[in-house]
Amino acid sequence: MCGLNVFVSSRPAAGPPDPATRAAFAAALETMHHRGPDDTRVEFGDGVAFGFKRLAIIDREHAAQPMHYHDRWTVVFNGEIYNYRRLRLELIREHGATFATEGDSEVLAAAFHYWGVGALPRLRGMFAFVAYDTWTGTVHAARDPFGIKPLYLLETVDGLFLASERKALAPFSGPDRGALDTDALAHYLSFQFVPEPMTLHRQVRRLPPGHRLTWTPGGGLRLERYFRPSLRPLHVRPEEAHAVIRDALRDSVRHHLNAEVPVGAFLSGGVDSSAIVALASEVKPDLHVFSAGFAHDGYSEIEVAQDTANQLGVRLTPTVVTEDDVIRELPRIVQLLDDPIADPSLIPLYFLAQTASRYVTVALSGEGSDELFGGYAIYREPASLAGIGRLPAGLKRGLRGLAHTLPEGMRGRSFLQRGTTAIEERYYGNARIFSPDEKADLMRFTAEPHTAVTAHLYAETADVDDVASMQYVDLHTWLPGDILVKSDRLSMAHSLELRVPFLDQAVYAAAAGLPTELKLPARGRATKHALREAMRGIVPESVRERRKLGFPTPTRIWLKGAIGDWVAGLMAGSGARSLLDLEYAQRLLADHRAGRADHSRKVWTVAMFCLWYAIFVDGTIRPAGSWSPSRPRAIIEA
């Protein structure tokens, strides 16, 4: 896993970049030093620049990047191709391809040389890459099907810029002040993250998951989707489905263990991480696993994880996070994310990755399981609302009007509201923060509604049940916009490569055809039923039957203590009041601290934006540990 940046000029005949541009490009690369501390290289040519920070995992001695192939292609690649050995043999057999290294980056370059965009469906892994055709001046780039690896892009009159993190584009995009995308901010207040392909900088966008781009000087940018996840239920026998899931996940885990560096895993004690650890320990009995928790009763997974580790026979190293740790590191965490994410679970993830990086260079984790196998409790909502949904339309309208007259927090109010609201209006992801009415009170600007993000997703799933539609929405919003962003940034912050076996194409295929009744049986409260059954006999029974835990985070408690004081001060002095009514947010905080209501998620969402604003716009907060690009590190320049 690595960091890349690329510049291709709209005027290639102008020659190599001038000294000022070269210095700015090298300095921008240094903002991503954490992504690849093992090797730094930059190359400049006529109208092009390539920068690469390498975290060496495969063929550590020889597979440096940028990678050149057949005097035609220059490739920079962030990620891992797990089936590269098989692809290498196919390229040799079909085309007589030759190789100078034993790594996957050269295989990727050769695959693109011989197969072109037809290589993309053959790739099994996580990737974001840029391939420059020196013969035609064309830029090709692509991102893996689910968006595990990031790729940001900026197109200006000067040319095309691409990078693994948005901060590496800052010298070329200009400051966030005056360029803030208020539609993106409005969506952040709804979703708790900025949905792809948007960023808070209106000029910078992300290449969407499962997409490729081509760009030529004078020809502009063209995007094309090469992968679209589909959740179309099939008629399958439960026993067969469970066997397919088990075999696919076992094979995926074995491929994800391939590395020339120490490999460990995250363990929460839930079925997802326990399944990965159990299957990994079949191959690697000495597997080292890691868990995190907080110094608050009821907010730690460590005891559960330790019990699971003992049953699986693996070594666990725990991490306990304190409030002082949070106050000290939160500015750095927000800076690493590039755009704010108000998901409190990113805090334990940061410290978990920090601890793991002291022992291993690669860690396996359970992201993606909930979206594929139906792991969120909210997916049970359509069944619970089915009765009210069958009422006549006129009666439902009357009940909806009644619900709005009931006091906030009154028992039954939310049930009536949600039961009389169409799913495409009521469900827009796993973390609905501010409602449209609340956003109208908070925002000092007008913006497009949240349905601008989700409407086309519901249109694409009009022929499936509500649960499949909800999963589809999460696969396109919550997973790439929240889960995978925090996983990538907060692991790479510590030069740790995080791998996610559940997002392997074969595991996805095993999950895609599951009917809802195999994921969420009508009886009981279990989620991910098919996965739990597939893991029977592999993970301990106590784990297999345990309900989903997530990363429990005590934000509700924090906001009533020292962290609440810190948040109050942050809001009081924030320049973000030009965009948000912070007096409104401060009233929410006051009500929360007085115990009149639980506004922790809303307050946290506003606070994280205020912190982001102080770092990226006002510059009033400079996180500890920030890299100053004023003096680049030693660089190998070609």
Question: Where on the chain are the PLM-derived regions?
Answer:
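Short clusters of hydrophobic/aromatic residues that line enzyme substrate/ligand-binding pockets
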Residues: 42, 64-67, 99, 123, ...
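Alpha-helical subdomain
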Residues: 335, 404-408, 422-426
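Cysteine-centered catalytic environments shared across enzyme families
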Residues: 1-337, 349, 353, 536, ...
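Short low-complexity, flexible loop/linker segments enriched in glycine and/or proline
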Residues: 331-335, 379-381, 558-560
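Active-site adenylate/phosphate-handling loop in enzymes that bind or generate adenylated species
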Residues: 145, 157, 351-409, 461, ...
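Adenosyl-5′-phosphate
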Residues: 1-4, 19, 27, 174-177, ...
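Short, basic, helix/turn surface patches
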Residues: 130, 341-353, 392-398, 573, ...
